[in-house]
Curated annotation (Swiss-Prot):
Composition-biased stretches (Basic and acidic residues): 250-261
Protein name: Probable serine/threonine-protein kinase DDB_G0271682
Binding site for ATP: 366-374, 387, 651-659, 719
Protein species of origin: Dictyostelium discoideum (Social amoeba)
Family: Belongs to the protein kinase superfamily. TKL Ser/Thr protein kinase family.
EC class of the enzyme, as a word: transferase
MF terms (GO), sorted A to Z: ATP binding; protein serine kinase activity; protein serine/threonine kinase activity
This enzyme's EC code(s): 2.7.11.1
Region annotation (Disordered) ranges: 187-261, 823-874
UniProt domain comment: The protein kinase domain 2 is predicted to be catalytically inactive.
Sorted UniProt keywords: ATP-binding, Kinase, Nucleotide-binding, Repeat, Serine/threonine-protein kinase, Transferase
Residues at the catalytic site: D484 (proton acceptor)
SMART domains in the cross-refs: S_TKc
Domain Protein kinase: 360-609, 645-1018
Length: 1024
């Protein structure tokens, strides 16, 4: 409501005051909008504050400067702060939709083309999974007072829209003590008593007061005026609420009314002429009032028309927005039919979770697989197994399907199927809780027990248990496909009863057994051949996996590589394998899924075997050489065991348990600390956890985490890996410690225990990787600097291959080459010198206790980033700026987590498919071998990315034009169909030749790294 402060009461009745009222000016609302960002959701995390300007503010990567998430585009959103009315609106600009969180309201998904008004204390998440920032809006509650002429007009900010749009203003008088509201009413004088009566009635309807022109009717007029005043007050209140009324202008006061009376102040009657003149004046005044009322009515009609037009426009905009949303939904549905979305599931409160997180007590980690991580917990005094499902395997559109699956899992009851107990939201991830079996997985039993400790009868009984459990799942309604059947997903109790587990991510097929599903959740060695060619999953896929499990139980071995691609299509069988077992394995692993038996048929054969064994009293234990030619009494130095204790140097403490080799070791411990492996090659590089300070988590993934910290005053990069380290991996780290080259990230040390270990490496800086360079700065690439980068990349791999022993990278991608520059190295050295000065005392103490440990320095004076993962470079991608001169970039190769040495003892591990499938050489699928020429194939794919980006100024993923259900299917196309990336027609012939030679199907024909470097130098000479 507006209030009027009188500056001069004597001039209240002058007509100028009424005319000036429409010209009152309003001062804008002063609005201050600040955004508050937190790096982490915990309460102790520091807060970054960013104040918005009046007008348009772009929010995106680099705006504000500390916002550097790669998932946020540079023009992700726009926030507009209005200077006139103080409104704050949010417009979505980027592809990743933002989400608005408001108290007591459901989250609002921001879409492009729709503006959303922001309120104080709103929270906005710029994409799914990001930490939301808060919005704080401060406004002046009222307009500033403006004194104009004879009065001061003050308006509340809440009435802004009404007073701006209304043709007139609501006016009230104020006093120094209390503010009272009186309606100022126009006075219309009539010519005669009859007119007085009619006018009184009319004025009552129009909220106006009439004064009579004789003394006899003065009292009545006064009463009418009072009544009309009351009516006006009520009407004014209603008008203020509806914001639609036309308010009367201020008119003459009672002083003018006295001048309009027919009797002079000295009580002398007027003459007829004077009365006639006075009547004429009154008629003229009445006409003016009527004209004014007509104009006011026209203004009201125009205002209503304007409001109707605005409403009509808003309705049209809403209809257009709805049409756009419908089109977007249709496009999304069409897109989902061709390609599955990889967006994580949002676990909502509506999911029926029956176990609370605070009811679970963590005991230990059991392991991790393709579909999730398994840990042992205690729930209400009972040991349970909890599987946390990887977010990347769940999608937003699968919520209803998951709830349906959970409802069916609760109904499963079979002695050979693990009991499903419920679901839980654990650390923000969805978890499935099942019963816990003491002996662990079948793989644990086969690894920890000697072959002679399990009789043939017990092994067949275990196979019958597996077949019975799988037959129950396949004959359930609807049928349940496991998709990841292997020894790790079969649990064993104390009596060697086996139960099928880890089918929490299996999907239900509604069309019967003939239907198939295409959700990949398997492990390579157990995958049936039809899955590779895109045929999808049927129940016969589980039968193939069971054939591999049958081979595991008989041999105690663990399969490696893609068995289905071998000439046999199944693992190699021992020469003395019983014929009945050999036949069953071949039937289950038949390349034609239609010729494989179902589990009902498998059960009949297994029970027949079991009865024959018992009837013949053939309970002899399997001889240790029945399925192996290996000697159990091997020396420690030749051991390839992944679980035992291997000690080649002096070790303090007591070693408990028996030390064996060839996968026959028990879970032995050192000082009760679990499996411990200490080699002479690595003991000087073992770092104690308390020597790493100022640790900061960069990113957390399913099987590892990337951190940064300080070691002896220098910034280091830390890759923390879930799972224990085995003797061969420890020996590998010992060789990596000897790498000292400006072309490779330097290994500093390792921190390890029984459950996990961490690799400590030098810190390269925040310049990102070759992949981020191509994605963000493709326009800066030319043939000169591109070929220079290609030469450096090739030289870094050449260094590894010429190392003694030769090192095969086996995980070459465009993201495993980090960027550094001389300028950045100098700045980092200065920072490290300061850190060294501040931590001299700590370093001295550490040196006294660790005289043999590496000092973590760099012979070249460089402090560079270790990193072994794609995620590390993604977090630093946004920090690549124009300050990094591409012509001065230095390449450092990293990510040796999958590297292997080209030695005879590593022959088996070299057969396993590692790394990114898009870069994997075809011989891994067809020949199951890996050599230095395999690295050259992967290197050629990286060079293809680099040269294509330079040529087209746009980065595209290899095989982007090929439609795949899963990335691993590309191996089938490159191996069986000889598919290769498409080279642009205008690519220089010299470059095309290098690429095509590098990815020859016959690895022997691929050029050496020396040849590639020579040809690149020739290309630079010709093209530059």
């Amino acid at each position: 409501m507006a209030t009027l402060d009188l500056c001069n009461n004597e001039h209240l009745n002058e007509t100028e005051s009424a005319d000036e009222e429409d010209d009152q000016l309003q001062t804008p609302i002063k609005t201050v909008v600040t955004l508050k960002f937190k790096e982490n959701p915990d309460s102790t995390s520091p807060i970054q504050v960013f104040q918005l300007n009046i007008g348009s503010n772009i929010i995106g990567r680099g705006s504000p400067s500390f916002l550097n998430d790669i998932k946020i585009s540079r023009r992700h959103a726009e926030i507009i702060v209005s200077a006139e009315v103080g409104n704050v609106t949010f417009n979505q600009l980027g592809q990743n939709h933002s989400t608005l969180y408001r108290k007591d309201q459901t989250p609002i998904k921001m879409v492009r083309g729709i503006s959303n008004q922001l309120l104080d204390d709103d929270l906005i998440s710029l994409y799914d999974g990001s930490i939301p920032f808060s919005i704080h809006i401060e406004r002046d509650n009222q307009f500033m007072s403006v004194c104009e002429g004879n009065f001061i007009l003050t308006q509340d900010a809440a009435d802004t829209n009404y007073h701006i749009n209304s043709p007139t203003k609501t006016i009230t008088t104020t006093s120094t003590t209390t503010t009272t509201t009186e309606t100022l009413i126009k006075n219309i004088d009539n010519n005669n008593n009859n007119n007085n009566n009619n006018n009184n009635n009319n004025n009552n309807n129009n909220n106006n007061n009439n004064n009579n022109n004789n003394n006899n009717n003065n009292n009545n007029n006064n009463n009418n005026n009072n009544n009309n005043n009351n009516n006006n007050n009520n009407n004014n209140n209603n008008n203020n609420n509806n914001n639609n009324s036309i308010l009367s202008k201020r008119s003459r006061d009672n002083e003018n009314n006295h001048n309009h009376q027919y009797i002079h102040h000295d009580k002398t009657p007027l003459t007829l002429q004077q009365q006639q003149q006075l009547q004429n004046q009154q008629q003229l005044h009445q006409q003016q009032q009527q004209q004014l009322q007509y104009e006011q009515l026209q203004q009201l009609q125009q205002l209503q028309q304007h409001q109707q037009q605005q409403q009509h426009q808003q309705q049209q905009q809403q209809q257009q927005q709805q049409q756009q949303q419908q089109q977007q939904q249709q496009q999304q549905q069409q897109f989902k039919k061709h390609k599955r979305e990889n967006t994580p599931v949002i676990v909502e409160d509506s999911l029926k979770l029956n176990i609370q997180e605070n009811e679970l007590l963590f005991i230990k980690k059991i392991g991790s697989g393709a579909c999730g991580e398994v840990c042992q917990y205690e729930w209400k005094g009972t040991p349970v197994a909890v599987k946390t499902i990887f977010k990347s395997l769940l999608r937003k559109d699968k919520k209803e399907e998951f709830e349906k699956e959970v409802s069916i899992l609760k109904c499963l009851r079979h002695p050979n199927v693990v009991l499903f107990m419920g679901t839980c939201l654990l650390n923000g991830n969805l978890a499935i809780i099942t019963e816990y079996l003491n002996r662990g997985s079948l793989r644990d039993v086969l690894t920890t027990m000697n072959k002679s400790e399990l009789s043939l009868s017990v092994k067949v009984k275990m196979l019958i248990d597996v077949a019975q459990g799988m037959n129950y799942l396949h004959t359930y309604s609807p049928p349940i496909i496991h998709r990841d059947l292997k020894s790790l997903n079969l649990l064993v109790d104390n009596n060697f009863n086996v139960k099928v587990s880890d089918f929490g991510l299996s999907r239900f097929i509604s069309g019967g057994i003939g239907s198939s599903a295409k959700t990949f959740c398997g492990t390579l060695s157990w995958i049936a051949p039809e899955v590779f060619n895109g045929s999808g999953y049927t129940t016969k896929v589980d039968v193939y996996s069971f054939g591999i499990v049958l081979w595991e139980i008989l041999t105690h071995k663990q399969p490696s590589g893609n068995i289905s691609a071998t000439s046999l299509g199944h693992p190699e069988l021992p020469s003395n394998c019983p014929q009945s077992f050999s036949d069953l394995i071949k039937e289950c692993c038949n390349r034609n899924p239609d010729q494989r038996p179902n589990f009902s048929q498998i059960l009949l054969k297994l029970k027949l075997m079991y009865n024959q064994i018992n009837n013949n009293n053939n309970n002899n234990k399997i001889d240790s050489s029945s399925f192996h030619n290996n000697n159990n009494n091997c020396s420690y130095n030749n051991s390839n065991d992944n679980n035992g204790i291997l000690v080649t140097g002096g070790v303090g403490g007591n070693v408990s348990g028996n030390v064996e080799s060839n996968n026959n070791n028990n879970n032995n411990t050192l000082n009760g600390a679990g499996n411990v492996i200490i080699l002479n090659e690595i003991k000087d590089f073992t770092i104690q956890p308390n020597e790493i300070t100022n640790i900061k988590t960069i990113i957390v993934k399913d099987s590892y985490s990337i951190l940064e910290g300080q070691y002896k005053g220098k910034l280091v990069s830390i890759k923390q890996i879930n799972g224990s380290i085995n003797d061969f991996e420890m020996k590998q780290l010992g060789v990596l410690a000897s790498i000292k080259s400006p072309l490779a990230v330097r290994f500093i040390g390792v921190v390890f225990n029984t459950d996990e270990y961490a690799i400590i490496s030098e810190h390269v800086g925040n310049n990102g990787s070759l992949l981020t360079l191509m994605q963000n700065h493709s326009n800066q690439l030319n043939w000169s600097n591109t070929i220079d980068l290609a030469i450096q990349i090739t030289q870094s791999i050449q260094y590894l291959h010429k190392h003694q022993p030769p090192i095969l990278h086996r995980n070459i991608t465009s993201d495993c080459f980090l960027l550094s520059s001389l300028n950045n190295n100098s700045n980092q050295n200065n920072n490290n010198n300061n850190n060294n000065n501040n931590n001299n005392n700590n370093n001295n103490n550490n040196n006294n206790n660790n005289n043999k440990k590496n000092d973590g320095g760099d012979d070249n004076g460089e402090n560079t980033n270790t990193t072994t993962t794609t995620t590390t470079t993604t977090t630093t991608a946004t920090n690549i700026t124009n300050e990094l001169n591409i012509n001065e970039i230095k390449i450092k190769v990293h990510d040796f987590g999958l590297s292997r040495f080209n030695t005879q003892e590593n022959e088996e591990s070299l057969k396993e498919i590692k790394g990114n499938f898009l870069y994997s050489p075809p011989e891994l699928l067809s020949l199951n071998t890996y050599s230095n020429k395999s690295d050259i194939y992967s290197l050629s794919i990286v060079l293809y990315e680099l040269f294509e980006t330079c040529l087209t100024k746009t980065y595209k993923k290899p095989y982007h034009e090929v439609t795949l259900d899963f990335d691993f299917q590309i191996i089938h196309k490159t191996s069986k169909l000889n598919l290769r990336p498409t080279i642009s027609n205008n690519m220089p012939n010299e470059i095309s030749k290098i690429l095509q030679q590098g990815w020859f199907s016959d690895s022997v024909l691929r050029p050496s790294l020396d040849t590639i470097i020579k040809e690149l130098l020739i290309c630079k000479k010709n093209l530059c």
